[in-house]
């Protein structure tokens, strides 16, 4: 299983609208994607326009090829993209250690 970590900065004053949009986008678009497991969105405390979106995928290719290269990605970006103050920084991680 792969963890996608997206660091998102939105325009000031758009928190409520962005949070509604990202929830809708996850539920209606990303949840349909091949290999999707779960997603969480965290809002920054010190920087309230900053969000961390984490998504678990079965494989890296489920995100980078199937989702990003398929018809769902433009739908996703149409929902959340207008809120971005700058392009998100996206990285992928694999579990190295765990407890619980």
Model regions and ranges:
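Intrinsically disordered, low-complexity segments enriched in polar/charged residues with Gly/Pro
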Residues: 14-16, 27-30, 41-44
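Glycine-rich beta-strand-turn "strand-cap" elements at beta-sheet edges
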Residues: 40-52, 75-100
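Short, flexible segments with low predicted structural confidence
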Residues: 1-2, 18, 34-36
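Feature targets compositionally biased, intrinsically disordered low-complexity regions
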Residues: 12, 24, 34, 43, ...
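An amphipathic, aromatic/His-enriched active-site/gating alpha helix that lines ligand/cofactor pockets
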Residues: 24, 28-36, 56-89
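Short, well-ordered beta-strand segments in beta-rich or mixed alpha/beta enzyme
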Residues: 2-9, 38-68, 93-94
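Short, surface-exposed ligand-recognition loops at beta-strand->loop->(often short) alpha-helix junctions
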Residues: 9-22
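Residue-level signal for secondary-structure boundary sites
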Residues: 16, 61-63, 98-100
């Amino acid at each position: 299983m792969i963890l996608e970590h997206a660091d998102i900065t939105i325009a000031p004053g758009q928190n409520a609208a962005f949070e509604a949009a990202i929830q809708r986008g996850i539920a209606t678009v990303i949840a349909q994607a091949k290999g999707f497991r779960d997603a969480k969105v965290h809002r920054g405390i010190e920087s309230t326009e900053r969000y961390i979106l984490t998504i678990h995928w079965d494989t890296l290719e489920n995100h980078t090829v199937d989702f990003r290269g398929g018809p769902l990605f433009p739908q996703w970006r149409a929902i959340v993209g207008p809120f971005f103050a700058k392009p998100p920084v996206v990285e992928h991680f694999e579990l190295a250690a765990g407890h619980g």
